[in-house]
Amino acid sequence: MLGLAEYYFPIFEEALDAECMPLELKYLPVIESALNPRAFSRAGACGLWQFMYSTGRMYKLEITSFVDERRDPVLSTKAAVRYLKDLYGTYEDWILVIAAYNCGPGNVNKAIRRSGGKKNYWDIYYNLPRETRGYVPAFIAANYVFSYYNCL
């Protein structure tokens, strides 16, 4: 995966930097797709950033029987950055943004309501879908591993 990181991370970093967003978000596709642009989930998510059809279309990715821009590293990265930026505009908390990226803003909003309006990830943890409860810690671990793999 480190070889793939050398190819894809500069694409991710350029797009994130252009929008003044945390460069650590480049690790999301590690969790989403293991940096495989052809990855396809059981739920129908596709590409490096694992866009669902509806989210991909919302962010202007062309998806037809001939073309699927969710698999295009540059176009899907630009769309993912716009989506992450929109989520940050809603939550103003990067951990909640990462959770919402995984399970959708509707599920995060429901978890916040069920937690009495608390907006701290760890306060809403048990009200999130099981997959998302593992997703955020996996993202944190990927950050650590990729940042310190030379020291291991």
Regions found by a protein language model. Name each.
Residues 21-38, 97-102:
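Short, functionally critical alpha-helical segments immediately adjacent to catalytic or ligand/cofactor-binding
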Residues 33-36, 55-58, 104-107, 145-146:
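Solvent-exposed loop/turn segments at secondary-structure junctions
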Residues 38-60:
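Short, surface-exposed glycine/acidic/tryptophan-bearing loops
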Residues 1-14, 18-19, 63-66, 70-90, ...:
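Extracytoplasmic and endomembrane cell-envelope/extracellular-matrix remodeling and assembly machinery
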